[in-house]
C-alpha cells in the first residue's frame, strides 16, 4: 500500500489514450485532468467537438450570445458523466468571482456555474475557454489502474493545445509533447 506522499498527482496533465484503448468513449482522446487525488480524478476531453455550437447552446439556456466570432465555436463532449451539465475550462479572469469555480493547479480554472457563460455572452468573461458537456471521472485508484494497464500516457498539459490548436490536431500535438506520434506509438508495452 502506498503512502499518500508516494502518490503521483496528475492534476494539470493530459491523459492521452493509447491505441489499445478498449473503451470507444475514450479511443483517440486527450483528457485534461482538472483534479486528481486519493479520492479519484476528474477531467475533460478536449478533442471531441460535438455538432452543437455556442449559439445554439446559449439559446437553449436563454442567454443571448452577442459576440459574432464566438457563435459557431463548438461545444465539446467532455466525457460520459453528467452529460447535460456544462463545464468551462478557461484561463483565470482577473477580478472574476464565479460562483462554482475551481482553480486547477498550474493556472487554469474550471467553472460549472452559469455566471461564467453570462460573462462570455457579454464579452466580460474569459477570452480563452473550452466549453464541454459532461466530464470524465474515475473513482479512487481507478485511473492509476488504467495507467498501469497501459491505457493512458500522461504528460504535463500545455494550454496552447487546449485553446490554440485545432481539435483534430490536439491528439498528435499532445503526443508531440512526449516526442512521439501516433504512427510510432504501439498499443503493446511491457513492464520490467
Curated annotation (Swiss-Prot):
UniProt organism field = Burkholderia multivorans (strain ATCC 17616 / 249)
The cellular component terms of Gene Ontology attached to this UniProt record, alphabetical and capped at eight, are:
cytosol
Superkingdom is: Bacteria
Point out the signal peptide segment: none
Q: Per the similarity annotation, which family is this?
A: Belongs to the UPF0301 (AlgH) family.
- Under what name is this protein listed? UPF0301 protein Bmul_2524/BMULJ_00714
Which InterPro entries does this one have? Answer: AlgH-like
Q: Which SUPFAM superfamilies match?
A: VC0467-like (SSF143456)
